[in-house]
Amino acid sequence: MGQKIHPFGFRLSVQKNWSSRWYANSNNFPAMLSSDIKVREFLKKKLAHAAVSKIVIERPAKNAKITIYSARPGIVIGKKGEDIESLRSGLQGLMGVPVHLNIEEVRKPEIDATLIAESIAQQLEKRVMFRRAMKRAMQNAMRLGAQGIKIMSSGRLNGIEIARTEWYREGRVPLHTLRADIDYGVAEAKTTYGIIGIKVWVFKGEVFGNKIEQAAQPAEPEKKVRKSGAKNAATS
């Protein structure tokens, strides 16, 4: 189960929290869920170059509070706060309620799974060799304190005729251990050969109460190649 299920959904009742935090009755739920999806798509489009890791949406009493976690908060805020005011007005138009925006800085983007996946996707779009991009990302993550990392790429890697899946792992990535703090991220690289999907799992330690166990000695990197048909080229 741990190998197939989404790592966040598997750990929601143990250590992870929801990205949308509000309550709605059965009549209002579809509209509010649709609004959340539109907000995330709007922010993803507007902040494509701001290295956004996570967006948390809360709805207290006829208001909305949106927290954006970014490795480049200066790009989100803009000169003298102009960009963030433009974002706020756009979000208020989408949601129909007053919106409060908070910007949180991601201090270690090298061990953030979403930012790692997006970085690899950008490199693949610039025709960097996928193995080089994956290994460089793994080395940076292990150097900055990750206990383990696994990166998977799927599609027409290096422009080959038949799509395949290739992954590398360094250290431990215990997906079935509920107390393991696993960060997970996905991205798509739109290359001239088609879409290449990237998935990243980062193991940051085991959670005991509010404490995370520190990193142990890293293991040797592991590589595995699995060939698949073209219909499995891209990952979601």
Curated annotation (Swiss-Prot):
GO CC terms of this entry: cytosolic small ribosomal subunit
Molecular function terms from GO: mRNA binding; rRNA binding; structural constituent of ribosome
Signal peptide: none
Region named Disordered: 215-236
GO BP term (any one): translation
Domain KH type-2 residue range list: 39-107
Top-level taxon of origin: Bacteria
Keywords from the UniProt entry: Ribonucleoprotein, Ribosomal protein, RNA-binding, rRNA-binding
NCBIfam families: rpsC_bact
Subunit description: Part of the 30S ribosomal subunit. Forms a tight complex with proteins S10 and S14.
Family named by the database record: Belongs to the universal ribosomal protein uS3 family.
Function (record text): Binds the lower part of the 30S subunit head. Binds mRNA in the 70S ribosome, positioning it for translation.
Name listed for the protein in its UniProt record: Small ribosomal subunit protein uS3
Source organism of this protein record: Methylobacillus flagellatus (strain ATCC 51484 / DSM 6875 / VKM B-1610 / KT)
Lineage, uppermost ranks: Bacteria, Pseudomonadati, Pseudomonadota, Betaproteobacteria, Nitrosomonadales
